């Protein structure tokens, strides 16, 4: 038997092309001596022949095995494949095997003459997530070219990965590889390595968000791999929380319980996990955590927020004080609209009047009309809460709550001014119509409702106010001026169509529009008679004082009739600065500084 060592790559199951390889002697019948890469041969590589680099075949398997040849056997046959890249025989002897994920395997190859510094090996190591091998390959032959190859891969990692679930393994691989890179920063390639670390962080962030943000991602990844990922990569609590959220979505109990074991002494974080268990209505995990030494009052609030009645009942049975923390459990249930929990808490002595009737005020603010009705039925005095309750409902646009409050006797008179203005502010023409329908005199509130609607760009409300007869020219056309300042061209147009005076306050609306450099509004105003030269050319001067103004806006104003000769020095200085002294003939600036005659500046 020959003592020379040859190499072969095999999978963990030791199969290839329907042939099962066993330790010791392996053979084939009908050995083929003709052709290249044909069945009926046992292939292997000679490490002493550079053309037969075993690393070409890394993608064929998981382990490297030593091959020796039974040269003393009279039936033994061997040839070099016509491709020249491998040998083949009818009989081989398989010896020691070494895993390709181990850097020592590559050191062993190199000791037998294999060139392990081929660039394609770097790609293979990345694609198979062998971080220790990749680091070994770089460290043993560190140069800029090889680092640039890694950099290129990092910039487009998906080019090597076809399976979307591999995102998990990419992130895991990069977390580990980044630790290796940190040990290389003190050398002549430190800038490149630092960039690789930064690229790693970006890829990790991107893929991690994709992993944890997609409910269907990674369902076939073993839970033990997720657990290993958490402990091996020193993840912060924010990242762990994202994994937990994904785990609850997909009912991955092993991961959740593993994280609980990691934070068994961190009661604050256990409360966070409890909140997630409530969010996903996972009673088993919630009950596990309740048995820990966590704050049960805060847990009750989490259960109320999530609408998890089963756990609310469980905690109340354990004599948790439902009126502690200023009655937050009931207030929370009212805020998030969980009527069944509100009913349960009230029937278990929760104080509906706590914190100056906060429960009903929160229900009004968040639009839960069924809870508002329930609390009134349980004894809330509508006259005590009516003002703030109406304001809360109006602020958020909850017309149905306002209708219920009025039906139950809420006094709207004391707050009708506030309600009118808030309805105009919050884009709710339906509430405004409701107020008019129940007798509120909107027109008696002055111009403020119109001003608020114009400032907020509420076109439908402005139209409604015009329809019911509001004076759009009040306060010397303040509504038009506010609309120009806020930049709502559609409202400017509507006001002008209904009689607003574009020249009010000596063309203030146009001057403000020029100050804001609003082409559309300036065009509307000028086309409706605004004087662009008013106040000694103030519109152009205001535009010149706006640092964001563009060259073509100035030309636009001149085309509209702005007088460039008025206040010559101010306009010249601005235009000269804007064009860096090189004013093109295509723009119409027919003057120069300190000259009264018209000369084009070149």
Swiss-Prot record:
Database matches in InterPro entries: Ankyrin_rpt, Ankyrin_rpt-contain_sf
Keyword Repeat: yes
Intervals holding ANK repeats: 133-162, 269-294, 295-324, 325-354, 355-384, 386-414, 416-444, 445-474, 476-504, 506-534, 536-566
Keywords: ANK repeat, Repeat
SMART domains, alphabetized: ANK (SM00248)
UniProt cross-references to Pfam families, sorted A to Z: Ank, Ank_2
Protein name (record): Putative ankyrin repeat protein L100
